[in-house]
Curated annotation (Swiss-Prot):
The modification ADP-ribosylserine is found at residue 150. It is found in: Nucleus; Chromosome. One of its GO terms (molecular function) is chromatin DNA binding. The gene is H1-4. This is Histone H1.4. InterPro entries: H1/H5, Histone_H1/H5_H15, WH-like_DNA-bd_sf, WH_DNA-bd_sf. Residues 1-15 have a biased composition (Low complexity). Histone H1 protein binds to linker DNA between nucleosomes forming the macromolecular structure known as the chromatin fiber. Histones H1 are necessary for the condensation of nucleosome chains into higher-order structured fibers. Also acts as a regulator of individual gene transcription through chromatin remodeling, nucleosome spacing and DNA methylation.
Amino acid sequence: MSETAPAAPAAPAPAEKTPIKKKARKAAGGAKRKASGPPVSELITKAVAASKERSGVSLAALKKALAAAGYDVEKNNSRIKLGLKSLVSKGTLVQTKGTGASGSFKLNKKAASGEAKPKAKKAGAAKAKKPAGAAKKPKKATGTATPKKSTKKTPKKAKKPAAAAGAKKAKSPKKAKATKAKKAPKSPAKARAVKPKAAKPKTSKPKAAKPKKTAAKKK
């Protein structure tokens, strides 16, 4: 009895695993079938755009166009009606006749042109952004070049005043030598001017002879 007891619960385990795999396969297969075809809204817009009727396309004409494209109309009748209502609410389709899904529908030209314009604007904005990025690159080059120029100029300016100071110092001893040379010859010139002043008493001798002439006249 001890040998047969553990064998009984091991048998139902594989039976439980099999239905889980089947369910997973069914879900994957259903998802693939739904994703394979385009959505109903796209098929409706294409059918309405292809029609040349001015008053719009009726629901019956839409179903015929969808059936010709290979869409199962009988199974997806409710989806067609919901797709028409959503397209009218968005503004892609305009309902010219009737109410709800039972009526005639036409493409909204304003909505179609409005969808095309934003795409063109986005493309233009992307083109405008590219030259702005290219213009930033030369700015970086100029920023790096400016400090190099400043470092080169500063030592040159410092050297010039040093050279000018050296030139001034060299000129100043020349002036001192010139002043010393000029002052030395002035002293003999003053001595020469003093000597003629001592000869003035010689001129006083002829003045003393004047009274002699007057004495002769009295005789």
